[in-house]
Amino acid sequence: MTRNLEKKMSIREDAQQGKVTPLFEQCAAVESMSVERLMAGVSDGTIAITKNKNHAFSKVIAIGAGTSTKVNANLGSSKDINSLEEELKKLAVAIKAGADTIMDLSMGGDLQKIRQEILKNCSVPLGTVPIYQVAAEVVAAGKEIVDMTVERMFEVIEQQAKDGVDFMTIHCGINRHLQERLKNQPRTMGVVSRGGSFTLDWMNHHKRENPMYEYFDDLLAILKEHEVTLSLGDGIRPGCLADATDRNQIQELITLGELTERAWAAGVQVIVEGPGHMPLNQIKANVLLQKQMCKGAPFYVLGPLVTDIAPGYDHITGAIGGAIAASAGADYLCYVTPAEHLKLPNCSDVHEGVIASKIAAHAADIVKGLPGAIEKDNAMAKCRKELDWKGQIELSIDPAKSAQYRHEGGGDATDACSMCGEFCALKVFERSQK
C-alpha cells in the first residue's frame, strides 16, 4: 500500500487503488481496526465513510462491516413549527447525547438558511432528503407537489451537495413496475415514506418514470463530484406490522440491490435504508435479505418498531427492534423519539431518542464482539461491586440522568442506594464471606 496525502475526489476509488489517506487512518483508529481492513471494506462497499469534500467537521465516521453500530438523529422544522434557534438547540442536544450523524428533514421556514446553519454548527456528518425541499418550495408557492419539475429536483440535489451535505436519502428504487405492483397488492397503510409518497404522486400525475430511477447516472455524477454518499431510501417501507415483508417491500429491495452495484461502479459510496415497522420474528430475515440482495452494503434501519400500539414510547419499540436488527448485522440505526407518530420532537424527545438508540447499538456491539464493547460493561460491574458511585455515573450512557437519580434518592451521603439501604445484597454478601 502506498502513502498519498493528496485530496482525491472519490473515497471509494482511493480505497480501491490502495492509497492511504488521513481520512482512512482516522476512521481506522476510531474503530480499532487496521487501515488495511477499513480500506478493504470501503473498496468492496461493505463500509461507507460519509464525508462531503465541502464539509469540514471533527467527527469522521465509518459505517458498515466490523465498525461500531452508528446512530442517526433526525432534526428539522415543519410547516407549522419552524424555528432555526430551536433546531440548533436540538442539534446540540443530539450531538451531546452521542448521535453519530444528523439528518436535517426541514420542510418549513427558510430551508436553505436552516440547512446551512445546521451544517455550520454540525460536528458530525449531515444528511438530507432533497425532495423535501423541492416539495416544500412548490407548496409554499401555492402549487401542488405534482408541480415539482425534474430540473428543480436535480438543482436542489446539486446545491445541497455544493453546500456540504454528506449523505442524501433519495428514493431511487421506486419505478413504474413497483407502482403497478402496489396496485395489485394493497396494503393496510399504503406508503408511509414522505419521499416515497411525493415520488409516487408525481409519477401517477405525469404518467412518467421516477426521475431518480430514470436519470440515475446523472444523479451519480453529481454525488461523485462532491463526494456525497447515496443513502438509497426505502420509499415502500412498511408503516405497520401488517405490511411488513410484503412483495412490495421486497421488490423495492431487489431494485435497490441493483442500483447499489451501479453506484459502486460509478465510484459512489452507498448505504441502503430499511424498515420500518416489523414483528420481532421477521427482523433477522430482513437483515439477511438486505445483505444478500445488496452485496453487504451498510444497512440503515428506522427502528425497526416492533409494535404499533405504543405512541409516546416508540423510542422503546424502536430500540428493541434496533438491538435485534443490529445484532443480526444491521450497521446503522435511525433513532425514534417518544414524539414519533404524535408531533414534532422537542429537545427532550431528541435526547431520549438518541439515548434509547445508543443503548440498542451498544447491546448489539457486544453481540458482534466489537473491541471495547463488553469491556465497558465489565468496568461498570466492577464499579457496582465496589459501590463506586462516581465510577458508575461516569461509565453510564447518560451520566447526567444517573447523577440526577442518585441525588434524588438521597445517595450523595451514603454508599448505598435508597432502594436497599442496609439490606444491600452486595454488602450482605461481602460481609458473609469474611
UniProtKB/Swiss-Prot annotation:
One of its GO terms (cellular component) is cytosol. Its EC number is 4.1.99.17. It catalyses: 5-amino-1-(5-phospho-beta-D-ribosyl)imidazole + S-adenosyl-L-methionine = 4-amino-2-methyl-5-(phosphooxymethyl)pyrimidine + CO + 5'-deoxyadenosine + formate + L-methionine + 3 H(+). [4Fe-4S] cluster binds at C417, C420, C424. One of its GO terms (biological process) is thiamine biosynthetic process. It is an enzyme of class 4 (lyase). Gene3D superfamilies: 6.10.250.620, Radical SAM ThiC family, central domain. It holds the Pfam family ThiC_Rad_SAM. Zn(2+) binds at H277, H341. Substrate binds at N74, M103, Y132, H171, S193, R194, G195, D234, G235, I236, R237, E273, Y300. One of its GO terms (molecular function) is zinc ion binding. Keywords: 4Fe-4S, Iron, Iron-sulfur, Lyase, Metal-binding, S-adenosyl-L-methionine, Thiamine biosynthesis, Zinc. Its cofactor is [4Fe-4S] cluster. Pathway: Cofactor biosynthesis; thiamine diphosphate biosynthesis. Binds 1 [4Fe-4S] cluster per subunit. The cluster is coordinated with 3 cysteines and an exchangeable S-adenosyl-L-methionine. Belongs to the ThiC family. Catalyzes the synthesis of the hydroxymethylpyrimidine phosphate (HMP-P) moiety of thiamine from aminoimidazole ribotide (AIR) in a radical S-adenosyl-L-methionine (SAM)-dependent reaction. PANTHER family: PHOSPHOMETHYLPYRIMIDINE SYNTHASE, CHLOROPLASTIC, THIAMINE BIOSYNTHESIS PROTEIN THIC. Homodimer. This is Phosphomethylpyrimidine synthase.
